[in-house]
Amino acid sequence: MTLRVAWGITGSGDLLPETVAAMSALSETQDVEITAVLSKAAVKVVRWYKLTERVESFAKAVLIEEDANTPFIVGRLQIGRFDCFVVAPATANSVAKIAHGIADTIITNAVAQTAKSNTPIYVLPVDQREGTTVTTRPGGERLELAIRAVDIANSRALAEMEGIQVLAGPEEIADAMRECSRRRSEQQ
């Protein structure tokens, strides 16, 4: 049975190419149907990284945020039309909002409302470890960023939230989808 995945993308360039590659590989190796949900910021960043066509090539649908509740993805997540919700990569801003109950974008609202249901949520925060991280800019140049203590604290708070599983990296997405599939099988 096809696994139906809602994939929320925020405005992070960090881990974006790796996440797109992981989701693309998932679509090729597992029986999944992916609906991409892009925040307003994600549209710009995905375009900046020249990944729009790649996402469109494997996603069944690509939904673009108009406001926090449009397109209306929340209802489909709550009633089980999707087997799980993956938010990857998640910016420090989105993680902070989720951790503190702010639901003012399509992604943060979808997480807040989905957490009230039985639909599993998997989130990949970009800022999880102390120190510096090296990411790649759209042109391939390296960019070193210092991770703020507040962002790490918000990622930890997110990990403590009921119904949300924090992923350490894009390489954990396939395992999370296998877990989601197993959970769905147990519920049937």
Enumerate the predicted regions with their spans.
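A cross-family phosphate/adenosyl-ligand binding-site feature
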Residues: M1-Q188
